[in-house]
Amino acid sequence: MTSRRLASATASVLLTLTLCPAGAAAHGLAGKRFFPSALTIDDPFVSDELSLPTFFHIRQPGDAESPPGQITNVSGEWSKRIFPDLGLTLAGDWTLLDPAPNGRTESGLGNLEMTLKYQFFTSAAHETILSAAFGWEAGGTGRKKIGAESFDVFKPAILFGTGFGDLPEPLAWVKPLAVTGLIEGVLPGRSGNKTFSLSDDGDLEIEVEKNPNVLHWGFAVMYSLPYLQSFVKDVGLPAIIRQLIPIVEIDINNPLDRGFAGKTTGTVNPGIIWAGKHFQLGLEAILPINERTGKNVGIRGQVHFFLDDIFPNTLGKPLFKW
């Protein structure tokens, strides 16, 4: 795409955003609270939605096993409600490693993922959502050279979201705050991978790479300017600004066993979301929490569509009712 066409497309998108009214008819609602879709951690609500694309880029320092390089990832995720409170999500991604651990530039698709989520509690008065999910990463469906594992991974999780809108009036300026989060087990279907090779003397050598169980947890703190304008006080923000939701996400992985216990990795992800009626745009920085995670700042961006608002009577409604 030429720079002129890119500028024209960008201007068209910005014009659409400015004219697009606020709010959401069904997506991520608990009472007056609209929960936007977070970019890094999973959301607690069940809805019809499409994240396409989600873009990720970061430079990685080298280590004993791989040279320094950069990772670029583009992913998509489609969620569909089977029943009003039960949904299924399908996700896939494409990764570019420059270079890969083998010293060459490698690219390819990652493993396919499927998640079943049940939103079992919703409180309109307290702007609270609770849900349970079970994810399955189908081993062997992605390219091994970009890091796709050959074994299945299972991911049971509890997710939550709550707004502060029920606080007393003296704390009115805190009411736009909301928190979402999850606690998830990442359970590999195989405890280790065996690699067979021959030594210089012709002896058979067996190398075992352990796959630990991991406690994955995280949360997002967001301040909703749409909530401030609509339910606290109209402070006269310009139309495009009043749809912004500043957000900070924390994403942590704690390996639990098989020689990896205590080797925590994670990121802090500050950013901004623009939420319209039919879609949202998000952009975040990626800040590693320690040297084990990395040393460089990355970037993540996302275009997210609210299918339940775009197609409320067809593609965006549950397949069945209870």
Short names for language-model regions:
Residues 25-322:
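Transmembrane beta-barrel domains of Gram-negative outer membranes and organellar outer membranes
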Residues 1-11:
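Bacterial N-terminal signal peptides that target proteins for export
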Residues 14-17, 252:
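Local alpha-helix boundary/kink/capping signal
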Residues 16-24:
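C-terminal segment of classical bacterial N-terminal signal peptides
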